[in-house]
């Protein structure tokens, strides 16, 4: 005949509490181990996006003004003479440089979709050719053009715009100025048409 455990743990065994505690510890161990082995990207190299920046327009007044510094890959938002926001950006990559100069916001479109840059996709939604220029790249048979999404677009010169997009730590766009999500919203909401935009090298 087997002996029962000592009195100090007998209540746990009798009431099943020991099993419940062991089960909870095992579940916590399994759940916490999921983060130790993240799923790898399927293909390619994706550099980490840069930090978004900051925004504080409390007690700020005056007209909006945006300054983009290509060398720093930074954008600055002013109200009057007060700097109220700063963010990392990604400007035009080599061959697609963002033109320096003095401009103004001429139009805004929160849900803009490019008619020039995007992908050729088949009827099932599979991307056949990515990152294409529809003016130059021939469309493969059986595909259609799917324009790149450019949320919170503010156009300042022809097809050049500031908009939400992927912001790696280098110039990577087709000439537009990409901003991180929340900062694109802040700039869009606070820059009316006519806002001066200065792009410097």
Q: Residue spans of the language-model regions?
A:
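Solvent-exposed coil/turn segments that connect beta secondary-structure elements
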Residues: 71-73, 80-83, 92-94, 108-111, ...
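Short, solvent-exposed cationic patches
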Residues: 101-117
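Bacterial N-terminal signal peptides that target proteins for export
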Residues: 4-22
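Exported/periplasmic cell-wall-interacting domains
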Residues: 2, 6, 34-41, 93-96, ...
